Amino acid sequence: MAGIEPPPREAAFLVQELVTDGIEVFAGISRDPDFGLALAFGMGGTGVEVTRDFALRMLPLREGDAHAMIAETRGAALLDAVCGQPAADVASLARCLTVLADFAQQNADLIDEIDLNPIMVLPEGRGCIVADALIIARAHSKAHEA
């Protein structure tokens, strides 16, 4: 057993809130080689692979554009008060999309893609929670050349 180190006395834990009353959506940033950064938004979960129900906008994005993106998806009706469920916090979702777009633009030379999936949209007044996020850095950013 010589040379084997004991495990550290300190341990790290990640504790997260369990979200059970949110509606799953996704948002993603991708880079088109000709047109630049674009934002995709749609209903989350496995259904997006089947339904292809999403909206797409080139950046920059204003909050009004974000509301329009949300409204043009077929799944937008799920964000309304339906089947005894409260309405989702669409205003917070629109702000989330706008902040994501602003972040991508401010870091455009560093980012190729961003994927937020799922974003849990909570009942009105309670906001949104990003449950999983992935950022793919650009291989040849101006920051790396400096």
Role assignments for model-derived ranges:
Residues 1-146:
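ATP-dependent carboxylate/acyl-activation modules
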